[in-house]
C-alpha cells in the first residue's frame, strides 16, 4: 500500500472510497462503472497535483520511503552486478554500495548510496549517510574503473555525509574532498544521477561528473531546507520558505546550468511506478554513454572541469 504524503490527502480519500466500493461489490450490485470513474479522477488529481508541486513538496517526494533505492536500481538496470567491498584502509561502509556491472551489455562501474527500505536495512546502511571509509571505497572503485577503462555511473541519494564524531575523527572532510578530486581527475566517462535527495558534500563527493542527471522530483542542495531555516530564521518550521529560496528542484537547477538532463517520472512519482521510472533512467544512461564513450581521456577531464568552472559564471 502506498504511503500518502500530506498534500496527497484528496487522493488518499478517493483511493479509500475505491477500496470500499470494491469490497462492497457483489453479484447483486455492479459498481465497476463507479470504480472506473473514480480511478480516472485519481489519475487526473495526481497529474494536476504533481504538475504544480512546491519545492518543499518535491523534497517530501524525494524522501518518500517507497521511492526506489540503490538495490532496486541495480536489480532492474543491470544484467550482472558484482559488488566490491572495503576501502583497504579502515573497513567496509554499507552506506555506499559499488561494484562491476553490465547495462545493456556495456561494462561499467556503478556506485551509489543506499538508504534502506525498512528499520533493519536503514540501520545497516546508516540511512545512506556515509562515513570516510564509504567515500574512500568510492575512490578505490573509481580508480579501479579508470585503470580498466570502465565508465563510472553514480546514483546519489543521501541527506548528507554522516556527521558523527567517529566520522570526523577518521577524516570525513578530507575523504569528501579526495573523492571529489578523484571524480574530476578520471579519464573515463562519469555520469551521476540524483535519484532522491542530493545533500551537501555527501552528494557532490560522487557527483562531480561529466553529465549530471536528475529525476524530476529529486532535490539537490548544499543543506536540507530544515537546516537552512534553522540557521537563517532559527525556526525549522520555515523549511518550506527555505526550500523555495534554495532553488533545489530539478527545474531550477537545469535552468542554472548545474543539471544537464531531467529524467521524467511517472504520474505521482517514481514510488508509484518504479519500473517505468527505472526504464526511463536506463534509456537516459545509454544515451549519455553513447555520447561520452568516444571522447578521449583529456577531453573528458576538460569537459568535467569546465562544467564546474562555468557554474555561476
From Swiss-Prot:
It catalyses: N(6)-carboxybiotinyl-L-lysyl-[protein] + acetyl-CoA = N(6)-biotinyl-L-lysyl-[protein] + malonyl-CoA. It holds the Pfam family ACCA. GO terms for cellular component: acetyl-CoA carboxylase complex. Pathway: Lipid metabolism; malonyl-CoA biosynthesis; malonyl-CoA from acetyl-CoA: step 1/1. It is an enzyme of class 2 (transferase). InterPro entries: Acetyl_CoA_COase_a_su (IPR001095), ClpP/crotonase-like_dom_sf (IPR029045), COA_CT_C (IPR011763). PROSITE patterns: COA_CT_CTER. It comes from the Bacteria. Its main location: cytoplasm. Its EC number is 2.1.3.15. GO terms for biological process: fatty acid biosynthetic process; malonyl-CoA biosynthetic process. Residues 30-291 form the CoA carboxyltransferase C-terminal domain. Transmembrane segments: none annotated. GO terms for molecular function: acetyl-CoA carboxylase activity; ATP binding; carboxyl- or carbamoyltransferase activity. Keywords: ATP-binding, Cytoplasm, Fatty acid biosynthesis, Fatty acid metabolism, Lipid biosynthesis, Lipid metabolism, Nucleotide-binding, Transferase. PANTHER family: ACETYL-COENZYME A CARBOXYLASE CARBOXYL TRANSFERASE SUBUNIT ALPHA, ACETYL-COENZYME A CARBOXYLASE CARBOXYL TRANSFERASE SUBUNIT ALPHA, CHLOROPLASTIC. Acetyl-CoA carboxylase is a heterohexamer composed of biotin carboxyl carrier protein (AccB), biotin carboxylase (AccC) and two subunits each of ACCase subunit alpha (AccA) and ACCase subunit beta (AccD). Component of the acetyl coenzyme A carboxylase (ACC) complex. First, biotin carboxylase catalyzes the carboxylation of biotin on its carrier protein (BCCP) and then the CO(2) group is transferred by the carboxyltransferase to acetyl-CoA to form malonyl-CoA. Belongs to the AccA family. This is Acetyl-coenzyme A carboxylase carboxyl transferase subunit alpha. It comes from Zymomonas mobilis subsp. mobilis (strain ATCC 31821 / ZM4 / CP4). The lineage of its organism: Bacteria, Pseudomonadati, Pseudomonadota, Alphaproteobacteria, Sphingomonadales. The gene is accA.
Amino acid at each position: 500500500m502506498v504511503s500518502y504524503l500530506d498534500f496527497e490527502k484528496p487522493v488518499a480519500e478517493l483511493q479509500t472510497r475505491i477500496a470500499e466500493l470494491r469490497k462492497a461489490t457483489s453479484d447483486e450490485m455492479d459498481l465497476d462503472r463507479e470504480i472506473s470513474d473514480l480511478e480516472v479522477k485519481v489519475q487526473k488529481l495526481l497529474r494536476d497535483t504533481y504538475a504544480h508541486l512546491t519545492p518543499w513538496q518535491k523534497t517530501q517526494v524525494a524522501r518518500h520511503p517507497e521511492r526506489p533505492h540503490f538495490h532496486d536500481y541495480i536489480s532492474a538496470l543491470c544484467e550482472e552486478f558484482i559488488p566490491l567491498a572495503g576501502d583497504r584502509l579502515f573497513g567496509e561502509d554499507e552506506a555506499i554500495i559499488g561494484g562491476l556491472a553490465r547495462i545493456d551489455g556495456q561494462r561499467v562501474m556503478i556506485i551509489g548510496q543506499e538508504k534502506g527500505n525498512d528499520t533493519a536495512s536503514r540501520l545497516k546502511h546508516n540511512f545512506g549517510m556515509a562515513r570516510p571509509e564509504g567515500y574512500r571505497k568510492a575512490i578505490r572503485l573509481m580508480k579501479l574503473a579508470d585503470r580498466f577503462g570502465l565508465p563510472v555511473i553514480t546514483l546519489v541519494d543521501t541527506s548528507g555525509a554522516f556527521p558523527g564524531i567517529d566520522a570526523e575523527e577518521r577524516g570525513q572532510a578530507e575523504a569528501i574532498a579526495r573523492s571529489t578530486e578523484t571524480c574530476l581527475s578520471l579519464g573515463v566517462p562519469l555520469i551521476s544521477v540524483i535519484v532522491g535527495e542530493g545533500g551537501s558534500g555527501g552528494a557532490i563527493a560522487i557527483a562531480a561528473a561529466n553529465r549530471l542527471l536528475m529525476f524530476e522530483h529529486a532535490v539537490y542542495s548544499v543543506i536540507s531546507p530544515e537546516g537552512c531555516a534553522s540557521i537563517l530564521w532559527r525556526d525549522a518550521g520555515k523549511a518550506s520558505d527555505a526550500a523555495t529560496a534554495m532553488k533545489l528542484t530539478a527545474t531550477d537547477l537545469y535552468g542554472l546550468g548545474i543539471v544537464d538532463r531531467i529524467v521524467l517520472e511517472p504520474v505521482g512519482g517514481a514510488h508509484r511506478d518504479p519500473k517505468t521510472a527505472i526504464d526511463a533512467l536506463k534509456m537516459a544512461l545509454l544515451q549519455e554513454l553513447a555520447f561520452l564513450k568516444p571522447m578521449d581521456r583529456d577531453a573528458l577531464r576538460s569537459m568535467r572541469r569546465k562544467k564546474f568552472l562555468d557554474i555561476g559564471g
